[in-house]
Structures are given as structure tokens and as C-alpha cells.
């Protein structure tokens, strides 16, 4: 996993160049944006339990057949694994927001996840629905302007949404 700074330096070094004015300006903007990132990550981390629990409850209400007798998530062990996995995905979304890069989520969370769910008989579209529910809650929390560093957060919210979309796409 490389953060944005490391990537820019690596690219310039590969070319044998100093950082360009545009690259320095882009990194300066990233530094200015970092407080907003920290605010959002802090909010999501502080609300992680409720984000995951509410997404799980909504998923059970939406798809009871999966959680009833004979369903892929019927046993307590499977239900606990579902909650755990939603928590893992949320955690890696927060890492991605903090780094400004989703590669850590791809490398350590999403690679092979679809195949795992297929092997377990868990419908990927159900997992994707749970991820969508977390996305909706996370965006609502991140969009609350109280206690967030002043400034336009629309690009950061779009980035946050893209990490959830990436995770949802990885499981179907």
C-alpha cells in the first residue's frame, strides 16, 4: 500500500525528476484536505458498531430467507461471520479514506472475498446489499456538518461512496 505522497515521490523518482509545481500543489491540497479525512474517519470509527449492526438488521429484514432455517446465514456462527465481515469491510473503507487510496482494501480485504462467499453458499448480492446499507449510513454520518472542518466535502464524500461501491462490486 502506498499513500498519495509515496506514489508521487515514486513516480518522480522513476523519471529521475524533482517534484513538479503541479505535483507539489496537488500534495498541498491533500494536506489541506487531511483534516476533513480525519474528521470523517473519526466519525465512522466512533459509529462503526451502530453502522454495522443497523446494516445487518436491515439486511435480515430485507432478506429473511437467508437467515431462516436452511438459509446460508441460519446458524449463529454464520450470522456472527456476516456481522464480522461487514465490520471488516467498514474498517478497510476507513483505511482507504484515510490513505486516499483503496489498494489496501483490495489487497487485504476484497481479493478472494467473492470466491469465499460462493464457497459458503452466501449470496453475493445479499452481502452487496448490506454494504450498500452501510454506505448510506456512513454518508449520512459524514455529511453531518457539525464538528467537521469547514469547507466543501463533496469530493471526499464521493470518494467514500466509491470505496463502498468497490466493496459491493467485489462480492457479486
From Swiss-Prot:
SUPFAM superfamilies: Globin-like. GO terms for biological process: photosynthesis. The keyword Electron transport applies. (2R,3E)-phycocyanobilin binds at residues 82, 153. Light-harvesting photosynthetic bile pigment-protein from the phycobiliprotein complex. Heterodimer of an alpha and a beta subunit. This is Phycoerythrocyanin subunit beta. The gene is pecB.
